[in-house]
């Protein structure tokens, strides 16, 4: 994943974070808007696994026309992402060359400002309109973030790959703007005010790669960078895809093992996010993730200053078979037999893929 950018440096293991499991929408509605306390939910303790209890049933498969339209939209999001991030584009090409055309996406991830309707809700409503189901909230107190992930509608039977294969999970995070310093809050609010009703067209912004607010000045970017690298990233990238994630276990060659996949990536000259170790593993051992360091690109700010900014990265995830299905023959194992959801501890470290520490290490 997850994931992505980063605010304050990751806290130690003892300081980490909390995750609350949300009840299925029919039983307890999920609040998608802005920052603050989410809707009704059951407390599940720290960093609990997503697969700990029965998930809500997925929505029915989309009608043919809706499915085609939805895939065209996410394909356009992907095109913007690949045009700006040569690392992701090259790795996808290398995997296809080595493994054949078997790439499936585990999830897509986005970053938002959790204020005045520009947070999770601004993107979520598009996905829920097309059958996605809100699942769990994750909290990252040190980074002043919350996130919500969404499971796709039923999409069995798709034999395509990439955006034309099984639909990805969606992971949307938001910065809790009202927890920042007054100076940073003022900067973010200043740009939000120039957006008009841009939050209502977040999906369009993601497919076009355009900001819905005025292009920022460099000094504002610098101020946000000092307090929250996530805030600075979002200011200059807006609703663009933060990362896509290859589902390694859906590949067919030896690199379906994430450890071999990581070696494959490094052997081809790419640096992986080293925060907390190259491989991020959930406490149950069933969700294993890694990611590249974000690409950088020159950006000309509104005041004419041109500087390098972080763009996006690509993640890799292997979801292992749940214990109750461990005796299933390999050819009978489907995605619902594997570990689902996300893990706060993993995602917290994946967020660091756009941090200055990782970017500096990449260029070293």
From Swiss-Prot:
Transit peptide: 1-49
Record note on disruption phenotype: Reduced grain filling rate, reduced grain weight, reduced seed thickness, opaque periphery of grain endosperm and defect in starch accumulation in the periphery of the endosperm during seed development, due to lysine accumulation.
Protein location: Plastid, Chloroplast; Plastid, Amyloplast
Binding residues for 2-oxoadipate: 107, 111, 289, 313
Tissue expression from the record: Expressed in roots, stems, leaf sheaths, leaf blades, panicles, and endosperm.
Reaction catalyzed: 2-oxoadipate + O2 = (R)-2-hydroxyglutarate + CO2
Cofactor: Fe(2+)
InterPro entries: HGLS
Pfam families attached to this UniProt entry: HGLS
GO CC annotations, alphabetized: amyloplast; chloroplast
An annotated Gene Ontology molecular function: dioxygenase activity
Alphabetical UniProt keywords: Amyloplast, Chloroplast, Dioxygenase, Iron, Metal-binding, Oxidoreductase, Plastid, Transit peptide
Binding positions for Fe(2+) per the UniProt entry: 107, 243, 315
Function: Catalyzes the decarboxylation and hydroxylation of 2-oxoadipate (2OA) to form D-2-hydroxyglutarate (D-2-HGA). Is involved in a D-lysine catabolic pathway. Involved in the regulation of starch synthesis and amyloplast development within the peripheral endosperm during the grain-filling stage.
Family: Belongs to the 2-oxoadipate dioxygenase/decarboxylase family.
Name the record gives this protein: 2-oxoadipate dioxygenase/decarboxylase, chloroplastic/amyloplastic
Gene: FLO7
């Amino acid at each position: 994943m997850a994931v992505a950018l980063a605010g304050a440096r990751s806290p130690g293991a003892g300081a980490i974070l909390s995750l609350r499991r949300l009840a299925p929408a029919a039983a307890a509605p999920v609040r998608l808007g802005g920052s603050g306390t989410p809707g009704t939910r059951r407390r599940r303790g720290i960093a609990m696994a997503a697969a700990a209890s029965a998930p809500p049933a997925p929505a029915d498969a989309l009608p043919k026309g809706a499915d085609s339209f939805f895939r065209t939209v996410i394909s356009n999001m992907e095109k913007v992402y690949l045009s700006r991030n040569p690392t992701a584009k090259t790795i996808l090409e290398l995997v296809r060359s080595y493994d054949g055309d078997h790439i499936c996406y585990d999830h897509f991830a986005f970053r938002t400002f959790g204020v005045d309707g520009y947070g999770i809700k601004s993107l979520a409503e598009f996905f829920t309109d097309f059958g996605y189901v809100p699942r769990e909230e994750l909290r990252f107190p040190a980074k002043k973030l919350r996130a919500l992930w969404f499971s796709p509608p039923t999409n069995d039977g798709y034999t395509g790959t990439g955006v034309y294969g099984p639909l990805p999970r969606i992971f949307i995070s938001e910065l809790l703007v009202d927890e920042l310093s007054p100076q940073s809050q003022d900067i973010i609010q200043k740009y939000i005010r120039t957006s008009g009703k841009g939050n209502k067209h977040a999906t369009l912004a993601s497919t076009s790669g355009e900001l819905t607010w005025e292009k920022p000045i460099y000094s504002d970017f610098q101020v946000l960078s000092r307090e929250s690298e996530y805030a600075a990233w979002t200011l200059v990238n807006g609703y663009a895809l933060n990362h896509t994630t290859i589902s390694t276990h859906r590949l067919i060659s030896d690199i379906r093992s994430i450890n071999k996949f990581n070696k494959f990536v490094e052997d081809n000259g790419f640096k992986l996010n080293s925060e907390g170790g190259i491989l991020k593993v959930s406490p149950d051992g069933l969700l294993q993730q890694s990611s590249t360091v974000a690409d950088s690109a020159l950006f000309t700010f509104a005041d004419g200053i041109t500087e390098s900014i972080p763009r996006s990265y690509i993640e890799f995830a292997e979801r292992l078979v749940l214990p109750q299905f461990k005796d299933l023959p390999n050819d009978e194992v489907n995605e619902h037999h594997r570990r689902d959801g996300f893990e706060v501890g993993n995602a917290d470290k994946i967020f660091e893929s756009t941090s200055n520490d990782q970017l500096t290490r990449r260029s070293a």
